[in-house]
Amino acid sequence: MRRWLLLMFMFLSVAAVAQPDRVYKSLKDVSDPEEVYILRLRGKRLKRIPPQVYGMTNLRELDLQGNRIASLSDSIVLLANLERLVLSRNPIDSLPPVMAGMEQLRELVLWSTRVTSLPKEFAVLDGTLELLDLRSCRLLLDEQEAIEALLPSVKKLWDYACNCPD
């Protein structure tokens, strides 16, 4: 009986540590970066991705909506297990070509950013990326067509093309 109780305690202890469903909303809450699977740093006035995020090797979802991030570092590829990246409502206007190496990326949310094109290297993501959200990005028709040609099998969310002057 004692042995069974000890085994149950050990099992429950391990299960309590690894919490893939836990959503972290502050870096202060993180004690072990390898235990972070979902990180939502919305509206934190960040100008860049904090360096400690790149050590979160098991990170599956990174939500940076509503910050002040204008560019991404090539270090973003260190997040090799990232499946969902949300950059909505940031003043970002381009993505680094090295992101084409993010083979696990399934969703890229760029809603209401300044992005109007993607690096040609992103063509390799056509078989793995499932959703590209470019709503409210003020894309011109030729910009939409270029993205469509680059990623033909990816589901895209965007507004009707606008040929409006700024």
Model region roles, listed by residue range:
Residues 4-13:
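Sec-dependent N-terminal signal peptides
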Residues 17-19:
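Boundary of Sec targeting at the N-terminus
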Residues 27, 49-52, 72-75, 95-98, ...:
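The feature encodes a structural signal of leucine-rich repeats
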Residues 31-70:
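LRR N-terminal entry segment and analogous cap-like coil->beta motifs
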Residues 33-34, 54-58, 77-82, 100-105, ...:
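Leucine-rich repeat
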Residues 37-41, 62-64, 82-87, 105-110, ...:
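Conserved hydrophobic beta-strand positions in leucine-rich repeat
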Residues 43-44, 67, 90, 113, ...:
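Conserved "Asn-ladder"/turn position within leucine-rich repeats
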